[in-house]
Amino acid sequence: MQFMFPLPHMLRLKATVQPWEASVTGADQTRMVKRAEELGYDMIAVPEHFIIPRSHVDLSGPHYFHAAAAQGYIAGATSRIRINSCITILPLQHPIVTAKALSTIDWMSSGRITVTFAVGWLEEEFKLLGVPFHERGRMSDEYLAAIIELWTSESPSFEGKYVSFKDVAFEPKPFQKPHLPVWMGGDADAALKRAARFASGWMPFLTRPEDFPARIDFIKSQPAFRGGPFDVSYGVATSRVGEGHKVNRDP
């Protein structure tokens, strides 16, 4: 078992954070991540959104980081602890840019990066960034395959609907081999199938602890599951007020 440090002021959700967290500065966070490393914590994970419509601020809060940028900063401020995302919204950035950002951080940190990808849920955010919301699942499948091709092939080549490349060079490759660990976030069946195909870990959001065995069995029963160790994260401090979120269909 490993432990993830819940760094304050990574987001501001009224239902789940303490009011004092809004006063935590970047300098405070830097001291905290260093102390978390000294205390033996194993991982820090960074949430991500790019832009929040005013109509969603009461639900989602206004304060989020660009996950890869924050991961890079935390990696530079520490020497041992692993830095994950929770989550990186895969369809909202070009996969070549995402692959480059993560391989750069992994290479420079000597292999301390994990990424948790998910397809996203906030339709208005997709509209603001010009990304087709109802194609996000298909885009994510293609983007994942393209990113792994860039990370692992000496002569990367990919042909798809949303991204294509050939006759290209891509370095640095990730420090970790064959590539940095990829986890999948989400609770929908499509997310778990994606985890079986592409990932070595799963970060659920709504799954109840008593349902974990069945969901893990579902992942491992998929034809694309490659076997081997498979990590699962669970936020024991997660709280919910009222009905809360529901799992949406992942196209």
PLM regions and their residue ranges:
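N-terminal beta1-alpha1-beta2 module of alpha/beta enzyme domains
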Residues: 1-77, 177-180
